[in-house]
Regions:
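Conserved catalytic core of Hanks-type protein kinase domains
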Residues: 69, 94, 135, 139
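Conserved post-Walker A coupling segment in P-loop NTPases
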Residues: 1-57, 71-74, 81-82, 143-156
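Conserved Walker
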Residues: 55-67, 79-81, 86, 95-112, ...
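Hydrophobic/aliphatic anchor position in the core parallel beta-sheet
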Residues: 74, 100, 115-116
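An anion/phosphate-binding loop that grips the pyrophosphate of nucleotide cofactors and donors
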Residues: 70, 118
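Nucleotide-binding/hydrolysis machinery
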Residues: 5-14, 18-26, 104-114, 120-171
């Protein structure tokens, strides 16, 4: 699902409402694409998303990638248009295959989390402007919602208190 708005705070609020974060439901992980603007080989995104299983010096918590930490919750990605092309290709391959393999682990694991992408404009507009690859846009889906509209709809008492996470399950 793509949430677009020019204000990051509004995007985060809309994503949190879709996730049901305020009710303390499933886990929530975030990744800011600006951190990966210089990840020319895609090494850092591989470790951030997939994590590493080996290594004695690392604590178990530091080895888990964002996908493992998110579990069946939500992975909230911001500024993916700012990621290096190699980092976006790795993101695409993980989302398209719906599985990932942590570093040092021979067995792939399924991606079970909901992925919400926050951008300043809809993904299709970014692809037409050559800021994103069409393959990634097609894989992330064609559901594009304006953040302000989500907040307006979900903050009405009856809808928000019913089942906010079921609304995002279709994403």
């Amino acid at each position: 699902m793509n949430i677009y708005s020019v204000q990051a705070q509004i995007q985060r609020r809309a994503a949190a409402l879709l996730h049901g974060k305020e009710q303390g439901q499933s886990s929530w992980e975030e990744l800011d694409g600006r951190q990966l603007a210089d990840d020319e080989r895609g090494d850092r995104i591989s470790l951030l998303l997939g994590g590493a299983t080996g290594g004695v010096a690392l604590s178990p918590a530091s080895r888990a990638g964002l996908l493992a930490k998110a579990g069946t919750g939500t992975l909230f990605l911001t500024h993916i248009e700012k990621m290096a092309p190699a980092a976006r290709r790795i993101l695409y391959s993980i989302v398209a295959a719906k599985r990932y393999t942590p570093v040092g682990d021979p067995y792939p694991r399924p991606v079970n989390c909901r992925i919400i992408v926050a951008t300043s404009r809809p993904l299709q507009v970014l692809a037409r402007s050559f800021l994103l690859e069409w393959e990634l846009v097609d894989t992330l889906g064609h559901i594009a919602l304006r953040a302000e509209s989500i907040i307006g709809a979900l903050e009405s008492e009856g809808l928000l208190n019913s089942h906010p996470s079921s609304l995002a399950a279709a994403s």
